[in-house]
Amino acid sequence: MKKRYSSLLLIVTQVLYAQETIQTDRPDQTESTSITPKSNLQLESGFFYEKTDTESRNISHPTLLIKYGVNKNLELRVGTDFNSETVYQERNSGISPITLGFKAKLMEERKLMPSLAFLGQVTLNSLASKNFKTPYTAPSIRLLFQHTLSDKLNLGYNLGAEWNGVTPDVTGVYTVSTSYSFDEKLGMFAEFYGYLNKFEKADHRFDAGFTYLISNNFQVDTSAGIGISKISPDYFVSAGVSYRFSTK
């Protein structure tokens, strides 16, 4: 009887695990507090186009983020992009500096208290194509917060600091994003985010987009946004896919 009960419990556990849907950090700029499940590998990739002015544009084709779940509270990450930049008819293409990092869950959501996670990353200036190498290694840190407002509505926000690798100056980062689920597959988000540097004017932006679950482990997305500040890009668009699989 005990053996039969144990087998039934194992089946139920496997079914519940299989029903857990993929949680991604794209397409918005707000990093979620979710951790990739243990022993799972998650790939998030996409296309990104940004127009800054009449003479400047940037295309990432593709962007790539790889995440691996170490345990329920920790994931490891590596990311890079293949970029094509055009400035005054001069075009450069190549691989952006590789970024290594981790995300650690610090606190689960409790009543009015949000779930909390920490994201730490470092962009290695020398691991890039010749035209995209930077003078400095560029670390970044963020505190990630998330509130469940209802069974369909969530609020996420980040606060952090980052370095761009071009100068030694630090830039403050903030993001605020709301996401809404129409049903089990279709969702949308709207977001404000920005960058604050004492040596430059503030850069504030707005974006919005949609996500669609093909399966529990496969999601597609699309988004677009505009710059709000004078130094911000005119507009940007993105589309991508995310896929998760177990390595066991």
Language-model-derived ranges and their functions:
Residues 1-23:
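Bacterial Sec-dependent N-terminal signal peptides
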Residues 19-248:
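Transmembrane beta-barrel domains of Gram-negative outer membranes and organellar outer membranes
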